[in-house]
Amino acid sequence: MTWLHRESVGADYAIFINGEQITEPIDRFTPTEILISPYLEQGENTIAVVVVAEAYMDSISEQLNLPERKQFTNCYIFAQRRVGVFDYNVRLLPVGDNDYGRLKLDVYVDNTFTTDEELELGYDLYDPDGKLVDYTVNRYLIEAQSRDTITFKPYSYNSNHFRWSERNPKLYTAMIYVKRGGVNREYIPLKVGFAEYGYNEKGEILLFGKPLYLNKERYNSASDAKTTESQIKALKAKGVNCLCPDYPQPHWFYSLCDRLGVYVIDCAAISSPSKGDNRNVGGTPSNDPLLKDEYLRRVDAMYRRAQNHVSIIAFSLGGATTGNGYNMYKAYEQLKSYGDSRPIIFEGAQGEWNTDI
């Protein structure tokens, strides 16, 4: 399985392989991974990133601006084995009022062969002090041409003093690994924070059931991780503890926030204020059913990109002055269907039902 990871293109674009367009227009703001295996031929292939100019794309992304980055920074092609990990969802959550937590690890495994295939899937979990607290490995049979979800739910004892917060940004280390025929085939290292978020009827975001005091700052990452880290540290020194980007950020931004101890309200790359008050069908892009799929793609991409980061305390459907309508209703329903306890925020809801706080 061969994938193209793309970001920092600098414009909306489409992907062509060997002269054939394989994607619809993709927005410039959301880093994206595209499966390209079905379009590759034996021998040499040509991949083209072609800039497109579609009026509807601009209408959804008004007032969004990217920092200046070298074009195609962090763009690459990577390959995965035909039997292996497609994605994962990980949480380390408290168990009632007890002094321990429970890891919830969902691993999505793909088998693209036409035959059932066997593998061994396991993980190691280390606490922030480097102590091995749990490990397991099991054998599974994955049906031909299918995707299976394998769930682990072990307890993690003596976890309370490792509760993640802005003042105590302690991170566990987990390693997912795949073996076939006794040989290690895949390693996936990840950082996990022990935290549980929610919200109450007062519109407050909760951490371990208690309201968070948030000093928010609108912020998008700089062109590189080093500069961004310096800027975040400076903001923390001024008392800022919550960053509100305008669109999905590079992976390293969320990892920095996990490590530095700063909360993030992530946001889909949706902003259309100029027609926000026009609630006729098609008046605002948010109420144009023809754009529903593009809205859902952007919101889903935002969630999938950030879901495993402990610094994420809420998800925003779009800019505060973006109009409401059919597409925003569907976007809210889509995010709700994922079962995440973190609140969904849409300031443009203006009293309607498609926002949690």
Regions found by a protein language model. Name each.
Residues 1-86, 112-113, 128, 132, ...:
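Accessory beta-strand-rich segments of carbohydrate-active enzymes
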Residues 86, 174-236, 255:
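N-terminal carbohydrate-binding accessory modules
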Residues 158, 167-170, 223-251:
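Aromatic- and glycine-enriched glycan-recognition loops and surfaces
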Residues 94-108:
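Contiguous beta-strand segments within globular domains
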Residues 227, 242-357:
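Substrate-binding/catalytic cleft of secreted carbohydrate-active enzymes
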Residues 39-44, 106-200:
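Extended acidic/polar, glycine-enriched regions
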Residues 81-97:
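Low-complexity, acidic Ser/Thr/Pro/Gly-rich terminal tails and inter-domain linkers that flank the onset
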